[in-house]
Amino acid sequence: MPNTQPVGVAFADPEFTTCYASQEIGYSSAAQGAVTQATSKSTGVTLNKSAGKITMNGAALAAGTTVLFTLTNSTISANGVMIVNVGAGGTSGAYWPYVASLTAGSAVIGLYNNTAGSLSEAPVINFALIHGQ
């Protein structure tokens, strides 16, 4: 362990950090944004924020299929983590969102239709980044 000093039988290491919160932890409103897909569910979007909402296009998504689109975002680093979920705009439980890949400046997001029928809805995908170094 770098930066360690023996102290009896224990070690003091300044790399350890603890965060205690008595209120919500999250991003300020200035770090959040929203964007809407223009022409199809596979159309890429750009939103340079650490958290936000992506309103997908209302085009049909066949049963049991996945669509992929690219989110271009200058706040994404290759060492970051992206969390996604469906927040509104679609049949509850019908969609499974996921991050297919993450590179500096962009993420490929997938949306799977988990139903037995085609859906023509505009689900809203919420996302938040955990920034890595």
Model regions: which residues?
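Extracellular receptor-binding modules and their adjoining Ser/Thr/Gly/Asp/Asn-rich linkers
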Residues: 2-76, 102-133
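Terminal beta-strand-rich extracellular "head" domains
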Residues: 80-92
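Glycan-recognition/cleft segments
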Residues: 93-102
